[in-house]
């Protein structure tokens, strides 16, 4: 009996001390949580009681060199619903169908969905948003948002690019400089009860958004308009497939205008242009959207034809294998190995100097010059002049040069390369390389971006683009400027001549592949003033109907552009 009492007493003591120990542990844990983890759990509790809604930040503007706004923002609204706050679901559904023009089935599905916040429609105009707000229905949210707006719509569309539904850049400058243009979104924090219903008489917490920075570019809206008007005119009159125009400063590579016509509508970037309307709603719609957005100035390559003779001549002068006084003879063709390669003048130019050979754009002269340089050295000049590398322009999707391997260049390949066939480069590559030859021999990097500015026009960042000095001698550059001025004043580029101005330039007519298609590219590359170039213009007309010679149809387009931009840039006669 005594043993049982002792046993029970011991059992009670163990239970008592266990309870005391557990209580002490729990109290200690509670004290620890209150003193050291209190803030954390307070925040967690608040998060359970708060609903977040984003406040979209305004995207930075894109400006031309003079501050003209090329891309900005338009205030719009995003309409959302919170299911467990809606008190009159049928009325809400009817109102949203009426105001937003969305099918009832789609609206009902979203209104009846059990989620904390369900978006109904974005990019709703402010007027409609205000009407929806005026209904005063519980559970319907109208939040401020921004939609990208392009004041000039089609102007420089393939350079500027556009943004997607999330307001992030997709192509063009919008994509390349997205990290500078995008802002930081703000937040609206709303207190809710356990059911997720907003608590009355408790204000919202707001974290204001921060707008993106502005991008100032080298584009000039007026020059872009001049170039676009000229491209449009040539496109219609020549019934061409497309027209590309590049206007740049050859001394630093700043692009003042870039047109690839037809352009697309920046404010409706997924709406096919008239030429592609037949593909709307078909399986090929996306393919033709991609074609419409493609910038052939940088994304595509082509055989440059006779404009490349500028580079062949510069390489020959650098190599010392030709002088301005050298004499040649053109019977209308030249035989290289077993290949008879004709001149565009099939009856021949007869006896001519090197200067006259350039004025006449004589193929046999340039084949002779190319053979003098030799395949190995010519390939070295491709490397020296930068032709084997991308230009590095600050636009996406630049294509690479398509060139024979050094060891695969025989005499026939060398002959055709010397007058701009059997290899391909981009238009921007041609414009950049010729700029570098005529500017004294400095290989520039073509670019559009200049600097990033905040809303107060304070410069945040200036972009520097590399320059490679000495790709050719100043003496070579001077001779090339002289030779190309003669092409316009006395040679095949005379249709680009403007009284009172010294303009240098070179014509080209090249055939596309396959040759059997008989499609041609007419082009003209010019610069002014010839003795101290401040502006270079490249015009490319693809597959024009009727006459297709560059000197006949591309040179007048070049002249029209120069007649507008030379006085505008105040370049003296």
Language model features with spans:
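Beta-lactam-recognizing serine transpeptidase/beta-lactamase-like catalytic domain environment
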Residues: 71, 193-204, 251-307, 311-543, ...
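Periplasmic/cell-envelope proteins involved in peptidoglycan metabolism and beta-lactam response
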Residues: 1-275, 301, 323, 376-388, ...
């Amino acid at each position: 009996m005594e043993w049982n009492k002792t046993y029970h007493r011991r059992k009670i003591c163990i239970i008592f001390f266990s309870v005391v120990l557990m209580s002490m542990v729990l109290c200690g844990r509670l004290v620890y949580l209150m003193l050291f983890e209190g803030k954390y759990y307070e925040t967690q509790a608040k998060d359970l009681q708060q609903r977040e809604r984003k406040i979209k930040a305004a995207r930075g503007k894109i400006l031309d060199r003079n501050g003209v706004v090329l891309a900005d923002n338009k205030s719009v609204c995003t309409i959302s619903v919170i299911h467990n706050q809606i008190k009159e679901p049928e009325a809400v559904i009817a109102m949203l169908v009426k105001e937003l023009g969305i099918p009832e089935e789609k609206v009902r599905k979203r209104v009846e969905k059990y989620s904390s916040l369900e978006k109904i429609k974005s990019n709703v105009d402010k007027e409609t948003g205000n009407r929806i707000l005026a209904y005063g229905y519980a559970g319907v949210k109208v939040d401020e948002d921004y939609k990208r707006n392009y004041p000039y719509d089609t102007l420089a569309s393939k350079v500027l690019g556009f943004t997607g539904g999330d307001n992030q850049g997709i192509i063009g400058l919008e994509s390349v400089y997205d990290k500078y243009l995008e802002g930081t979104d703000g937040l609206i924090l709303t207190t809710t009860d356990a059911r997720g219903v907003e608590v009355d008489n408790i204000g919202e917490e707001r974290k204001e958004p921060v707008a993106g920075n502005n991008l100032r570019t080298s584009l000039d809206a007026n020059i872009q308009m001049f170039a676009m008007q000229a491209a449009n005119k040539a496109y219609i009159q020549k019934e061409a497939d497309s027209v590309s125009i590049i206007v740049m400063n050859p001394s630093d590579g700043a692009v003042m205008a870039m047109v690839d016509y037809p352009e697309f509508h920046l404010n409706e970037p997924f709406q096919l242009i008239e030429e592609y309307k037949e593909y709307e709603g078909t399986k090929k719609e996306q393919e033709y959207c991609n074609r419409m957005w493609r910038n052939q100035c940088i994304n595509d390559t082509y055989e440059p034809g006779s404009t490349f003779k500028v580079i062949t001549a510069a390489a020959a002068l650098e190599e010392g294998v030709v002088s301005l006084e050298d004499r040649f003879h053109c019977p209308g063709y030249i035989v290289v190995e077993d290949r008879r390669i004709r001149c565009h003048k099939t009856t021949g130019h007869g006896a001519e100097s090197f200067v006259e050979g350039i004025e006449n754009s004589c193929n046999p002269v340039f084949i002779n010059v190319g053979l003098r340089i030799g395949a190995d050295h010519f390939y070295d000049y491709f490397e020296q002049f930068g032709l084997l590398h991308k230009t590095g322009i600050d636009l996406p999707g630049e294509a690479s040069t398509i060139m024979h391997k050094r060891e695969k260049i025989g005499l026939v390949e060398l002959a055709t390369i010397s007058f701009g066939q059997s290899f391909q480069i981009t238009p921007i590559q041609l414009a950049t390389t010729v700029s570098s030859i005529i500017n004294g021999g400095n290989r520039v990097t073509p670019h559009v971006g200049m600097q990033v500015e905040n809303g107060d026009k304070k410069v945040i960042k200036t972009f520097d683009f590399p320059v490679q000095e000495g790709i050719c001698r100043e003496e070579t550059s001077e001779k090339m400027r002289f030779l190309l001025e003669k092409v316009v004043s006395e040679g095949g580029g005379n249709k680009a001549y403007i009284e009172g101005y010294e303009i240098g330039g070179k014509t080209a007519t090249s055939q596309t592949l396959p040759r059997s298609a008989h499609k041609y590219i007419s082009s003209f590359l010019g610069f002014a003033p010839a003795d101290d170039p401040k502006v270079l213009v490249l015009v490319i007309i693809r597959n024009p109907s009727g006459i297709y010679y560059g000197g006949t149809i591309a040179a007048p387009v070049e002249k029209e552009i120069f007649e507008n931009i030379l006085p505008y840039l105040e370049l003296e006669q």
